[in-house]
Amino acid sequence: MAAKDVKFAGDARDRMLRGVDILANAVKVTLGPKGRNVLIEKSFGAPRITKDGVTVAKEIELEDKFENMGAQMLREVASKTNDLAGDGTTTATVLAQAIVREGAKSVAAGMNPMDLRRGIEIAVAAVIKDIGKRAKPVASSAEIAQVGTISANGDAPIGKMIAQAMQKVGNEGVITVEENKSLDTEVDIVEGMKFDRGYLSPYFVTNAEKMTVELDDVYILLHEKKVSGLQSMLPVLEAVVQSGKPLLIIAEDVEGEALATLVVNRLRGGLKVSAVKAPGFGDRRKAMLEDIAILTGGQLISEELGVKLESVTLKMLGRAKKVVIDKENTTIVNGAGKKADIEARVQQIKAQIEETSSDYDREKLQERLAKLAGGVAVIRVGGATEVEVKEKKDRVEDALNATRAAVQEGIVPGGGVALLRAKKAVGRINNDNADVQAGINIVLKALEAPIRQIAENAGVEGSIVVGKILENKSETFGFDAQTEEYVDMLAKGIVDPAKVVRTALQDAASVAALLVTTEAMVAELPREAAPAMPGGGGMGGMGGMGGMGF
């Protein structure tokens, strides 16, 4: 086991504080509409330019191990806020730095760190309650656009694009962000249920130009197992032929004699048919087949339920207005399922999302929910260079996360105003224990940090801005750093999602309180390099070669 270096008390806190300051100072230059970019070296390819706090925080690794521990704890603040709210990482970092610095001063002055921590927790609880009271629900598409615009750094087209995508797919829908090959940024809406399985044979293609299968007013047979024999399928095929409508078969697989017969029927024109594999694997495949059954008003043919393929009737088949299948994907549009059944299934999936602790499972459940409840929108981010596209993609992702958070918990005045106004709620708290009160006062002072930083990044004195806002009695009065004017923040559309502000403060205070109560730090001592091997003394027995006449 390697030897360790241990630092105590003031020495430990000083080193830790240096690390906190290095990371926070690199991150906080990005805050606000006039925040600057940070350029990050990459081991290969062009450097990355970003205005995203968590991206900067993740890149910082310091040489001094004690300083690095402080920096890594602060990085944890940004990461946690990003995971929970998807935005507000820079605000969280600025708040954490302010709490740690004031806390370290108080500890150095002889106050009890555990009492300080209690005071910090009491004050944070009061602020969160205050933010909850101030939050205003997001009602219109215009308000969603405002949130997106602010989070994308004043880029109005991005805000509008996100609002448009949310309007199309609903709040439950999935919106993904991808890089575009062209210069333009655009929204692509996929209506209906789309899954990543294509046709099993190119002979099913109905549109040779696009190489797609297009089936209108179609019957859908959903089978849990493989279909390989023809005999069991004959009754249902004959019934579909008589109805004169096309048929789509979704099963674990269709192979052998069954697939050959379907292809021959399709080519002879007797039956307009196509077959695809069921999406997903194992239990997830079964769940997705059940989703499709509910969406199309059909029944999943499963031997567990006592239904065999031979006994299937037309009533058991699902229906849809249109199905489009290409080489890789299948899209079912306007399924004939009952609204009440679909809604019940949506609620069931929502309950599973609440219960699951696995991020992977949650993501898959959300995908299923979106396919049932609304659809999928893809925002394709374009730009002139790869560096520009990546920078813009960071901003679009932040804006998307912010709008989702706004829909969940509502909006509050932006630009650091909500935290500044919460000072009133904290100021009302009085505690008999002087050290606990000092902890409350630490948060009271830290609540000014984000608005001061926004002002300073805009080249304005932070303390003057804070003073002017607090003088005004209006709860929504604040500083527009873009125009350097004092305005009504809600009327101007400068808003923050309440969830982002709340999460930023909670995560900042949680990690900062841990740092304030740290009394010792342990790090591995750097290993001394092993001495180099002594130089070789030549090959033995070669000494007599000196006389050779070279």
UniProtKB/Swiss-Prot annotation:
For this UniProt record, give its keywords in alphabetical order, as a comma-separated list. ATP-binding, Chaperone, Cytoplasm, Isomerase, Nucleotide-binding
Give the reactions, separated by semicolons, that this protein catalyses.
Answer: ATP + H2O + a folded polypeptide = ADP + phosphate + an unfolded polypeptide
Where does it localize? Cytoplasm
Q: Which domain of life is it from?
A: Bacteria
CDD domains linked? GroEL
The residues the record assigns to binding ATP are T30, L31, G32, P33, K51, D87, G88, T89, T90, T91, G415, D496
Keyword Cytoplasm included in the entry's annotation: yes
Gene Ontology molecular function: ATP binding; ATP-dependent protein folding chaperone; isomerase activity; unfolded protein binding
According to the UniProt record, one GO cellular component term is: cytoplasm
Major location (coarse): cytoplasm
| Keyword Chaperone attributed | yes
| Gene Ontology biological process terms, A to Z | protein refolding
Task: State which Enzyme Commission number(s) the record gives.
Answer: 5.6.1.7
Q: How does it assemble?
A: Forms a cylinder of 14 subunits composed of two heptameric rings stacked back-to-back. Interacts with the co-chaperonin GroES.
Which family is it part of? Belongs to the chaperonin (HSP60) family.
Please describe what this protein does.
Together with its co-chaperonin GroES, plays an essential role in assisting protein folding. The GroEL-GroES system forms a nano-cage that allows encapsulation of the non-native substrate proteins and provides a physical environment optimized to promote and accelerate protein folding.
UniProt protein name:
Chaperonin GroEL 2
At the highest ranks, the source species' classification is: Bacteria, Pseudomonadati, Pseudomonadota, Alphaproteobacteria, Hyphomicrobiales
